[in-house]
Amino acid sequence: GGANVNGPKWMTKENLDPAVLVRWQSEIEQTGFDAECTALTDRAGKEELRHTLRSSQTLVRAFELAIREGHLPLEWSHLLLLTDRSGIVLSTAGSPDKLGHARRIGIERGTRLDLPHAGVNAIAMAVRLERPSHVRGDEHDLRLFREWSSLCTPVAADGRTFGFLGVCCPCPGESSDVELIWIEFYLQVLKERIARHCPMRRRMALDRRFGEYGLSPREREVAHYWAQNMGGLQIASRMGLAESTVRSMIKNIYRKIGVSDKGQFMRHFLA
């Protein structure tokens, strides 16, 4: 229906190639998957979890910051999930009772929600297809997911997927279009916030802006460090330059940008 208003096109089980579903089903069956289990028990190992949390640090911090910044109606009966690129849960958010329920059914940091471990669900689908996915109640393989509708979208910036953002909501039979539009808006807001807090993304955006002022590649590098509040000496040793060279480059940068001190420079770029 009207679910894809200005948003990504959601992949559903219906518009999936039947051959793909058959392949998935046989893959799931080979793992000795128990559709009737009352809680998910598959977790990432300690080492694997430590590794994925370390490499997804920026993403997790951005997610938690976005949640804290609020304007997201958390009294909503929804559970938000952030996973790494393979579907391992990195962070969860929602009302205390939703989080409590999630824990009871085994959804917490480290839970595997990918296809072999959790059957067909929106997170598993999005991980496989790298596309926004929507799975309704009864379409889930796991009985414990059948009272939920799940939606999931890749968190991508500059052509690279960093992880996945999922929403589970209790479904009275069918998710209404209004609900879907809401969730889509919600996911969009979170994705933008996450991208905004991603240093890589910020670095590229800053780089473009420095370029617009005609800064040379070396000046751009100095400007990056300066924007991170590094001192002249620190920048000099990092770049293998004399401090006096860095100082004169900073003067040049100010001239090109049209600012006269560090405060103005910071305000100009960190607004």
Q: Language-model segments: which ranges?
A:
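Recognition helix of helix-turn-helix DNA-binding domains
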Residues: 229-264
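Intrinsically disordered, low-complexity terminal regulatory regions
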Residues: 1-111, 125, 227, 263, ...
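Regulatory hinge/linker segments at domain boundaries
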Residues: 198-218
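Sensory/regulatory domains in signal-transduction proteins
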Residues: 85-91, 95, 105-197
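Strongly charged, low-complexity linkers/loops
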Residues: 210-216, 223, 227, 244
